[in-house]
């Protein structure tokens, strides 16, 4: 394997989701199979090295430098996990090393400092956990050693004086072999996870392939070369993705804050470039939000001058609300304050109008305060977890008895909107539309029901408007910036929020276009998933093919 061959391989699998990580693993696989560098018949075989290891271990025990321990047997040939070159040997993973027993100097986690004289190394993912200033706890390192995390399986090569952090650490000092190859082999070794259980026994029972000493050095040099190339490939990929992200963001930004003179050209460019601009799930998410933002700015469908203006809708909704009050189905409420020019987030097209939510819907209502319980009987109670991506999704709700005094008043009806008034700052204000059957389900008190007019508004347009970033940034976030902990945006605040309201006929056209474009986003997302799966299968097939030659003489073809 050389750099040119690796580059050729990378070109075939570059767009697979984990291509670089898999290539790194592939390099290690080649290394421990004797397929990364050619063998040299002049090298002293590994069997001679094993004799020196056994002799050195005996000397250390006799000198009292290490304690005698029960050693795992050298692996018989029948236990070989795969074929290795003739001069290599399989050995138990801990055989060519001895464990350092002087670990009573470890520092407790609570005593680890953010800065200090001596680095603290533990079994966590961070290479250096922190620092310690106590020289009595320092382990002096004259030659590199290996730290193995008994709980985490993390393996670290340490070539500096350090302090051991907390429990679960095993230190291995290699004997008569190249420490960096030993580290490479342990890093490659696949150990089953026992969660936070102990793994050192698994390590002792596992086998690693041991090449001649001279070949160990050649292998490590080649691994260093190819890993450095992987670093460059990874940096180039990140740079490429960052540029693609900036292009995608810039293209969508031009649509979100449109220039009337260039909007048509910007929109055409974005639509034509969609496959190039949407290469990751977050791109699709941004595209979906751009579609919603265009919808509420009057940029998604053309206006029709024959449409009845939105101001007439508000008059009809007000009359419908008055009729409900007269029939005593809802209470009369004070009129909302007129909208001042400075309140409007942006200018709408002439046939549209800005309106307060309380003037657009017939009424708002808090949910049930009755305690709900898991049950197969009764009325399901929807909670904030049921609001997902603009929809109200039913799943495993708790229930209240159907004899509750709050029913039937709090039954949901199809096309009701549910607004989450209490949640974390990131989630408060999320809204979904209820599309299930009438009078079968209710909702919890930290949700607010909005009942739209079904004759003078399109509830799905209202739901779209309340799920835009524009609505969140201008109507919700200003209300929660000064809050700490759980955020709350109550019903009074909700009724006073502003949304842009188009004519009813245009609302219907907008909803149809949003549905069409969201279906396109669904297809793009599915295409991404399919492409990723295809690239992953190609990656698997390519790496399997590259690892398949069993005859060492075939190595040069890799």
Residue ranges and their predicted role:
Residues 105-108, 127-164, 176-196, 388-399, ...:
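Short, ligand-facing micro-motifs at secondary-structure edges
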